[in-house]
Amino acid sequence: MSDSVQNLIAEPEDKGTRIDKYLSQELEDVSRSRIQKLLDDGNITVDGRCVKSNYKLNGTEHITITIPELIVPEILPENIPLNIIYEDDDVILIDKPKGMVVHPAAGHYTGTVVNALMYHCRDNLSGINGVMRPGIVHRIDMNTTGVIVACKNDKAHNDIAAQLAVHSITRKYYCIVHNRFKEEEGTVDAPIGRNPKDRKMMAVDRKNGKRAVTHYRVLENFDKYSFIECQLETGRTHQIRVHMASIGHPILGDDVYCHARSGYKLQGQTLHAGVLGFIHPSTGEYMEFKAPLPEYFEKLLKDLRNGGSN
């Protein structure tokens, strides 16, 4: 097995942040002690140079993290059907179903989007993020449905990654949340960082968190719930889930950030990535792609419209 390589681009708002602190926020599956060892061993470079843990970012650097590969099962192509929205020589956009993990990780080495892409695209996937994440430039949570883009070559990958870094990509999500809204629209501007009590969770962190902005618009109000559209200005891990919970509107079905009771039996959060738009890396044209609400989501909305209030 080869080493796992991950590439990150520091954002302007990261200026002045120590590299070890930055990485502890970005690498959710890597402990602080391992980050320190990676730095000490020269496995983390900033613009091609090894740095110490006290290095402070300028906010524009390319950061490469090389993690020596643990003994894990070989990642193999799998003939898993994909709901392809669009495909060309540079990108492929798919409508990801609920329950499917985007890339292999501990406990999920088969049945992922990556396994399916490796079969469908063969060797035509970008290699920037290493053997565990070929083609993957962004991701959505396992129980979030909807549109994601994968890249077939490194040029396209770098281009899309740069657009993500400057927040120029259009990303609209749809979700059902607890409680009715009084306002028709609004913005949550609250920094997000790792939950100090559980690194697998995120939390609003006004002292050490990274800038996170979510714009929301109420589409329908029901008795105890609301159907809303959320547009991401930034793209932090679990951003919509954390932001909605922070203002008293946790997402229905979210078993991590929602503590409100519901009679609906759901597999995770009722959250759908409905719209993704970006400048095409080869043509320079803006393209926008949509994924329809999944069947379970439509049935839930129908029940709420008929007066359901579980």
Please give the residue ranges for each predicted region:
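RNA pseudouridine synthases
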Residues: 1-187, 191, 295-304
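A general beta-strand register signal
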Residues: 45, 85-86, 206, 265, ...
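Short alpha-helix capping/helix-loop boundary micro-motifs
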Residues: 47-53, 224-227, 262
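Conserved "cap/hinge" positions at secondary-structure junctions
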Residues: 48, 67, 242, 260-261
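Short, surface-exposed secondary-structure edge patches
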Residues: 52-56, 229, 268
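Conserved hydrophobic positions within beta-strands
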Residues: 84, 177, 215-218, 251
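The conserved catalytic core of RNA pseudouridine synthases
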Residues: 130-162, 170, 174, 189-247, ...
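Short, surface-exposed loop/helix-turn segments at secondary-structure junctions
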Residues: 203, 253-265
